[in-house]
Amino acid sequence: MKIEHYIILMVILVGFVTMPLLIPTIKTTQTYSIFNTQENGCSNFLKLMHNSNTIKPLIYPYSNLRDNSILFIIGPDVEFSEDEGHLLRNYVYAGNI
């Protein structure tokens, strides 16, 4: 093999070794991440939810929202569909927060 092949092989090998080290760092520094302990993260909010035992996280579907409840939408990274928008609007119009 030529020296170029060895260099390419080494770069790929170094990439495979460093990726598992970099990915947790990226996930813990994302804005609004529950793993982010900085001021722009939600790790303290997650601890509060976990310790209170009265808060039930709801990820999906929004049709499961109950009356007299509070919904937190923190940094959505996807668009809401038209149906989801109607469900959320009706939820707020019904007097919920």
Swiss-Prot record:
Native species: Methanothermococcus thermolithotrophicus (Methanococcus thermolithotrophicus)
Protein name, per record: Uncharacterized protein in nifH1 5'region
